[in-house]
Amino acid sequence: MASEEYGEPAKHDPSFKGPIKKRGCTDIICCVLFMVFLLGYMVVGILAWLYGDPRQVIYPRNSTGMYCGIGENQGKPNVLYYDLLKCVTGTNILAAAMNGLQCPTTQVCVATCPMDFKWALPNGSPASVYIQEYCQPSINLTTTPLTVAQIAAKELCPVFLVPSTSFFNRCFPGSNLTFPSDFTINGLTANQSRANISEAASQILDSFNFQNVGKKIFEDFAKSWPWIITALVIAMVVSLLFLILLRFTAGILVWVLIVGVIGVIGYGIYHCYMEYDTLNKQGVSVSDVGFTFNLGVYFRVKETWLAILIVLAVVEAILLLVLLFLRKRILIAIALIKEASKAIGHIMSSLFYPLVTFVLLVVCVAYWGMTALYLATSGAPIYRISTVNTSVPGCENITGNETCNPMTFKPSSSCNEARCIFYRYNNEGLFQTNLFNLQIYNVIGFLWCINFVIALGQCVLAGAFASYYWAFHKPKDIPFFPVAESFMRTLRYHTGSLAFGSLILTIVQLIRIILEYVDHKLKGAQNPCTRFLLCCLKCCFWCLEKFIKFLNRNAYIMIAVYGKNFCVSAKNAFKLLMRNIVRVVVLDKVTDLLIFFGKLIVVGGVGVLAFFFFSGRIPIPNDSFKSPTLNYYWIPIITVVLGSYMIAHGFFSVYNMCVDTLFLCFLEDLERNDGSQEKPYYMSKSLMSILNKKNRPPKSEEKKKKK
């Protein structure tokens, strides 16, 4: 029944000796479409580069529209706001700074932010009251004929300065300011001045708590990056050592891995029981705590530890049952891993191919990021005349709609508080009106290129490992440069097929992004039915994406071996897997699970080491090598864990692809051959012994044995 529904088993082909040498180009239409799309993607990048100016985001501007830190303001990377009260009243200062906006007060580029309090005394001389560094370049305090009051009225120098810190090159007031007792501004009393400045500073700090958090995170990275790199190097070394050990002792390592997981869960059960027993004797119950958002409280009640204990016990029981009933399947999985170890041992260059994939992925991400940045900053900046208080005599006619040029703008005598401030970027013109469409094109190009690079790596590795499996006399029949040959063969003949498969995956991922966007926009305004429908759609497309990734992976293996187009290869791979569905579910997934556990060992080991190091729990006798004092020690720990997982995934993905390729070839081998002299098996003797298969010796040897 299975044969009729999912096709007949593959028949023996005497001429088949592994990946077919003579093949033609596949999915040419999709190849042409992909090339045209890439040309369009390059055009989008060129247009973005011509029209965009990322300096508008990277560098702040002064009141004249000049960038701080470059050009005439070289060495002055920070911008200082003269009247902080106007910034708080007129606009959201941090949001304005992040979007390139300016608040309605004079801004100048400065080398460093103010470190001390300073305020203007009306009876002093300009040189003694003001600081030249923080005044506009047009005024010289030693030679100016203007008085202190006239300079303050024209905002040529700041009336007051408070200790500030630089955040994204903007000078913001520091927290917990202690004002001098005689501090006064704008004719206010000392108490009123302190109250106004404190309120302005607190509004900024309270509205943007992430200011200090973000700054501290950057500081943590600056302090800990050498140790982060050291931890990532350790992760790479551990991954290589694990693969080397797997090369020689696959069976022992797999069983140690399984026993280790069971032991860790067993220890978790023991620890939960001890915590439960201690809290039970103390009589602390969840009824005594009630409902609270402080999750740490729940770990001080016995019911929490009892629930965790039950869950771990159930997981432990399931694992033991799986080991009991699937022991033979695990032995076959171990044999596949051993065979993969042998294959990688003969094709060591395959371990370095993830570096090629990584470089290509970095190029894709960098191109997407730069294109998005240049597109976002395209269009000339528009400035408009604005003032904080339109009720001031002479400022009634200022509506905020009149454009201006910050390079030539000067306040009128009737409204001295008028300022020329940034409004937005110009969105008129053919290019600017299509920015949203170009950003969508950029996202699609990013997803398609990323998926194509991953597909290329899978197909290249599949071709290399397939050449190992179908080599009857190993290693004599293995090509000299299997990875390089597979790479050139894949690019020459199957670019269209890889583009086709990656396009299908890109469409599904794009639909998922749209669903996430719709869900985000409708959050808080959707009814339960809409929420349920969106949740179902997101779940379905998540499953569809996983299925397409699985199908594409096996289709690329068939493409690498037989050189057929994507649809035929996907169909043949799907039918082959369905004809052997039990082996697929048990053998392939058990192997994937074991490799996943290997990743966890690498990531967990390096993560635990990073935790003890960055939390200061590892005593280092040498003072020159010690964990830095960090604000948030979990930031480098998370970075190390994520980086370790990426490194481990890169190395183990080679193993995973090798096992998947050998498994698919193994299924084809079982269908094509029967062990006879005309149809000998290509699988290793260990696999044949587990399956009770063997190749019959030649007739001449049989006669010798009979004699």
From Swiss-Prot:
Cellular location(s): Membrane; Apical cell membrane
Pfam families the UniProt entry points to: Choline_transpo
Domain of life: Eukaryota
InterPro entries per UniProt: Choline_transptr-like (IPR007603)
Chief location category: membrane
Annotated transmembrane regions: 28-48, 226-246, 250-270, 306-326, 355-375, 443-463, 495-515, 557-577, 594-614, 634-654
Keyword annotations of the record: Antiport, Cell membrane, Glycoprotein, Membrane, Transmembrane, Transmembrane helix, Transport
Gene Ontology BP annotations: acetylcholine biosynthetic process; acetylcholine secretion; choline transport; neuromast hair cell development; otolith formation; positive regulation of cell growth; thiamine pyrophosphate transmembrane transport
GO molecular function, one term: antiporter activity
Reactions the enzyme catalyzes: choline(out) + n H(+)(in) = choline(in) + n H(+)(out); thiamine diphosphate(out) = thiamine diphosphate(in)
Membrane topology of the entry: Multi-pass membrane protein
Family note: Belongs to the CTL (choline transporter-like) family.
Functional description taken from the UniProt entry: Choline transporter that seems to play a role in the choline-acetylcholine system and is required to the efferent innervation of hair cells in the olivocochlear bundle for the maintenance of physiological function of outer hair cells and the protection of hair cells from acoustic injury. Also described as a thiamine pyrophosphate transporter.
Protein name: Choline transporter-like protein 4
Organism of origin: Xenopus laevis (African clawed frog)
